[in-house]
Amino acid sequence: MMNTILELINVEKGFGEGVRRNPVLSDISLDVEEGEFIAILGFSGAGKTTLMSMLAGLEKPDGGDILFRGETVEGPSPKRGIVFQNYALMPWLSVEANVRLAVDAVHQHKPAKERAALVDWYVAMVGLKHARDRKPSELSGGMRQRVSVARALAMQPDLLLLDEPLSALDALTRAKLQDELADISQKEKKTIILVTNDVDEAILLADRIVPLTPGPNATFGPSFDVNIARPRERAAMNSDPDFIRLRASITEYLMDVGVSAKPETSRVEALPNVVPISLKSTSKPLPAAYREKAQSAIESGYVEFSNVTKIYPTPKGPLTVVDGFDLKMKKGEFISVIGHSGCGKSTVLSMAAGLNPINAGGIILDGREISGAGPDRAVVFQAPSLMPWLTARENVALGVDRVYPKASPAERRDIVEYYLERVGLGDAMHRPAADMSNGMKQRVGIARAFALSPKLLLLDEPFGMLDSLTRWELQEVLMEVWSRTKVTAICVSHDVDEAILLADRVVMMSNGPNARIGNIMEVDLPRPRSRKALLDHPDYYAYREELLEFLEAYEGGASPAEEQLAAIRQKRDQRISRQTCNKRVAAE
């Protein structure tokens, strides 16, 4: 019979006094069994970190009780170890010394030999035996977070609290640390509470998932039991019916309680009939020899990348980052580009934007060669570049005033307000950028890009800095606005689900250097799309599996064998054949 190690009974927490009190958590109740792995899923600002701080004894609740082994939590204790999102290491100490510092403080009554063995065991457990003598400044972000995990584990707590420990890491490093946490939880049989905003991470690691509703007055929603056998593998889970059902149920619940992409009632019902300056392109005309080819490209390839190559000089000689990138896009097509870090995705995008010179080949947009930046292209970067002292409206107006020089002030105002309302900022258009969350800033960036009426919209991991639940919301916003404009678009992403949701085709890049297109997947899913609808579509997980297998083949800088790539192509052909057959049956 399992023993209850932690009890939360009607816990309340807020900040401030009287009428200025900001209620954060309300009526939080939960029982955690010894050895259980709990994942708490929640939106940014819902109070997840506040909750973890109370469990660690760093904050006290305003009401209710938190009981650890039947005793009220009054303050911090080595029995409850915590790892925060931002690792706090002693920069002058080595990996070994950082872990030893915690061991010596908690296990001071143990013999020195036993303490040293504890340090060695946990440094090795997180895969840092080879780096034990390095300082934090010599470690990657993922390695530093491993030190934090090792330090917490070496204290041998009864309860390990993990407050979004992997959210700041790149996808590949995050996946590796997820595997290590899963392995540790099984070896140590430790009771673990993980705060995350990643549904797949929660399902991969947890025995039970507890969603936290959006604040203020956030509370726990219904829990979801994860009845999937361990060890769990991402590729295998993708085709597991239990995983598919659970993932859909959790996603649907979270979207129902917190994600809304519904546009606000707009003051501007229709855009004014004004012509952007981008229709008078400043790109240089094609040489005569290319004109016939360019005319064909306009019909079948509105955008054409022709043998595009990028070479950077290095002390060791020229380094070819992108080697012969070839792609044709139809007008109004949405392309996602996906691949591992360093594969040249952003380099391709920056060349299309005219921000990075091309060493060989060329890019044609609407019959003209791209030779530099221009108003016919708009870019949304990962970090929105806004003037912090200007309001949302003023930030968007900067570009609109330049792109529509012949429009009246009222017409330009209508364009700005139309797109700000489309991205859900109708009530915040007069708020300075400095007072906005990252999600709100990115909404301004999206509104600004669409307001320029570009021929080509370029999105460079536009949601990469946001938590996954905020990403869902902005993906829906992006889809809603794009469906109105049908602008030709390229989106660089490392998120498989995002790539499928947005794109008509997904371009998969091989590893760099000398990166090139490894595969192109056509996404034959109905539009308009929503995350909810896609999760129920019979072909969705087949697309997902194809992308995951491609990324897995190139994981860690690997060069996959031809047999491995052939197997991926064979599955793709089988999927296409099945889809064709299903369409034929439906037509009959």
Go through each PLM region and give its residues:
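Conserved ABC ATPase signature
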Residues: 135-139, 143, 432-436, 440
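Short helical segment in ABC ATPase nucleotide-binding domains corresponding to the A-loop/adjacent helical element
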Residues: 84, 96-104, 116, 393-401, ...
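Conserved signature/switch motifs of ABC ATPase nucleotide-binding domains
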Residues: 134, 155, 431, 452
